[in-house]
């Protein structure tokens, strides 16, 4: 796996986060290279303020921080950690780390944007750029050419202003725009709905998974979550909007609740949803990489709906890390509940970790399976 990016007679050593042995995926892509080469051709004055949005593992921040002031905005805790680690690895100056809920710096010289997967997140980002920037500030986005649709460009036109694209290079394309549309379109970051028959109301911020309705996996596990008067606490790992925590909290009013996700918007959404649905409870919502820093043998129950993407890449290492971390953090006799697509084979992974006799199927249907693993 390649860890050295050499471009324009410079070399950076870059790693994904968390750093893993036998890593097969590199920390940058051709889109990063295309942006770097294009911006270098602009010959920006030194100490220009470059605002970078969605710098997945800090490649752009590392490159431009040597000569410029850099602010990196991302909804991803892991992207923040990766950026800091790669800056240190390459002995580069620190950058300002912001979330995409923070105001866009209004003194930017140029904005570089890795297009997000979610259109709701993109619309939110574009609306905030329009609000913060003057019309002469270039906004340059990048993505794989096949992911830049006419509908994508229409969103730029609607929320920013006139928009053009580059030629494709290594299957990537640049998008050029500026904040000229007048008047600016107001965008509400929140989207809400109710879930029957559970008397649950949910509010989602723009980058939260399944942003405008309840996903089928969550709906299935809601039917089976347990009420247990002896349950002292539980962790919702990869909590998203916190819907599983809300339901478990309804069923177990005595339990302390901890929600963990790597998305800052997910954590903010979960915090609001728990407060709105459960009132004053012992609740902690934490942006984190899985269960990093959680003490061993400290939790009675963990519920987990693992993602199988990291940024744009399909991978199962996040689920594996979640399962390993859960085993470490669970008390003896503690339970891990997992919901997943049947074809992902989580039962095999859990049997490897917990022992085959300690893993059982709680429920399944044609698409999903709910598994329980008990720590012995």
Curated annotation (Swiss-Prot):
One Gene Ontology term, aspect cellular component: cytoplasm
The Gene Ontology biological process annotation of the record reads: rRNA base methylation
Q: Name one Pfam family in it.
A: MTS
**InterPro entries named among the record's database cross-references:** DNA_methylase_N6_adenine_CS, rRNA_m2G-MeTrfase_RlmG, RsmC/RlmG, SAM-dependent_MTases_sf, Small_mtfrase_dom
Q: What is its main location?
A: cytoplasm
Any coiled-coil ranges, and where? none
Enzyme Commission code(s) on record: 2.1.1.174
**Source organism superkingdom:** Bacteria
Q: Please list the reactions this protein catalyses.
A: guanosine(1835) in 23S rRNA + S-adenosyl-L-methionine = N(2)-methylguanosine(1835) in 23S rRNA + S-adenosyl-L-homocysteine + H(+)
UniProt keywords (A-Z) are: Cytoplasm, Methyltransferase, rRNA processing, S-adenosyl-L-methionine, Transferase
Is the keyword DNA-binding assigned to this protein? no
Q: Where in the cell is it found?
A: Cytoplasm
| GO MF term set | 23S rRNA (guanine(1835)-N(2))-methyltransferase activity; nucleic acid binding; rRNA (guanine-N2-)-methyltransferase activity
Q: Does the keyword rRNA processing apply?
A: yes
Name the CDD domains for this protein.
AdoMet_MTases
Function in brief: Specifically methylates the guanine in position 1835 (m2G1835) of 23S rRNA.
Q: Which family does it belong to?
A: Belongs to the methyltransferase superfamily. RlmG family.
Under which name does UniProt file this protein?
A: Ribosomal RNA large subunit methyltransferase G
């Amino acid at each position: 796996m390649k860890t050295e990016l050499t471009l324009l007679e410079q070399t950076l050593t870059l790693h994904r986060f968390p750093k893993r042995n036998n890593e097969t995926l590199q920390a940058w892509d051709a889109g990063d290279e295309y942006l770097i080469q294009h911006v270098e051709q602009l010959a920006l004055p030194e100490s220009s303020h470059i605002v970078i949005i969605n710098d997945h593992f800090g490649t752009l921040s590392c490159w431009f921080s040597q000569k410029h002031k850099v602010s990196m905005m991302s909804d991803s805790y892991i992207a923040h950690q990766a950026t800091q680690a790669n800056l240190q690895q390459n002995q580069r100056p620190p950058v300002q780390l912001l979330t995409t809920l923070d105001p866009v710096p209004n003194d930017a010289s140029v904005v570089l944007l890795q297009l997000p997967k979610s259109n709701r997140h993109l619309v939110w980002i574009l609306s905030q750029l329009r609000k913060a920037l003057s019309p002469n500030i270039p906004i340059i986005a990048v993505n794989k050419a096949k992911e830049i649709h006419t509908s994508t460009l229409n969103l730029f036109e609607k929320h920013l202003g006139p928009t053009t694209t580059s030629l494709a290079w290594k299957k990537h394309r640049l998008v050029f725009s500026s904040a000229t549309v007048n008047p600016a379109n107001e965008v509400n970051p929140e989207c809400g709905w109710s879930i029957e028959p559970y008397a649950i109301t949910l509010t989602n911020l723009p980058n939260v998974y399944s942003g405008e309705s309840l996903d089928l996996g969550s709906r299935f596990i809601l039917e089976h979550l347990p009420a247990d008067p002896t349950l002292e606490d539980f962790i919702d790992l990869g909590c998203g909007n916190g819907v599983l925590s809300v339901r478990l909290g309804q069923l177990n009013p005595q339990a302390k609740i901890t929600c963990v996700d790597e998305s800052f918007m997910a954590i903010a959404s979960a915090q609001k949803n728990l407060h709105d649905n459960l009132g004053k409870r012992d609740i902690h919502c934490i942006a984190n990489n899985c269960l990093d820093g959680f003490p061993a043998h400290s939790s009675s129950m963990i519920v987990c709906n693992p993602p199988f993407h990291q940024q744009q890449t399909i991978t199962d290492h996040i689920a594996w890390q979640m399962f390993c971390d859960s085993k470490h953090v669970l008390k003896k006799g503690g339970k891990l509940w997992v919901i997943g697509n049947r074809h992902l084979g989580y039962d095999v992974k859990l049997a490897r970790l917990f022992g085959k006799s300690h893993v059982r199927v709680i429920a399944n249907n044609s698409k999903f399976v709910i598994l329980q693993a008990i720590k012995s």
